[in-house]
Design a protein with these regions (language model features):
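N-terminal accessory segment detector
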Residues: 1-94, 99-109, 144-146
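Short terminal or interdomain "cap/linker" segment that borders an active site or interface and mediates
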Residues: 85-94, 131-156
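Long, amphipathic alpha-helical coupling/dimerization segments that relay conformational signals between
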Residues: 106-136
């Protein structure tokens, strides 16, 4: 039996665009030596937010509908999938199969991908009319070998 991690690793390696690899690695090298980590994360958050505005999610009434809407948009553009679940006072978002994971080479940080998806999901939640003061933030920073991003949505 093939492990889930092995399948995800294969998916991520085979679905990366070779035509962008050199550009992405050069971009990562330039920004990682020219900007503080906090500013890079803010940049990726803003890019995620802007992207979410271009792939708008319609109003949903239930968590299941929201998960379906998120995944419909993400899978249509080959950006993986999310699982939403409530635990305690928070809604957690587990995202897998992001094409960003590993696409920027050794100069990048898992925080960049997490920040990007913070921006995507924050914008989508805001489009649902969420209460002010609720934020999406990375629950844990992934190890470089991790294929999932865990985000938490709740009071800031």
């Amino acid at each position: 039996m093939i492990s889930t991690d092995a399948l995800l690793e294969h998916h991520e390696k085979t679905n990366r665009s070779a035509q962008w690899e050199g550009f992405n690695q050069a971009f990562a090298s330039v920004i990682s030596t020219g900007l503080p980590s906090e500013e890079i994360c803010h940049l990726f958050f803003r890019i995620g937010s802007r992207m979410a505005q271009t792939i708008h999610v319609e109003r949903c009434d239930t968590l299941d509908e929201l998960q379906i809407a998120f995944n419909t948009r993400l899978q249509a553009i080959g950006w993986g999938f999310s699982s939403l679940y409530v635990q305690g006072e928070y809604l957690f978002i587990s995202h897998a199969c992001s094409p960003l994971e590993g696409s920027f080479g050794p100069a990048s940080s898992p925080e960049w991908t997490a920040s990007f998806f913070e921006g995507v999901h924050q914008t989508w939640f805001e489009s649902q009319g969420v209460t002010a003061g609720l934020r999406v933030c990375a629950e844990t920073m992934n190890e470089p070998s991790s294929s999932q991003i865990l985000l938490k949505f709740g009071k800031a």
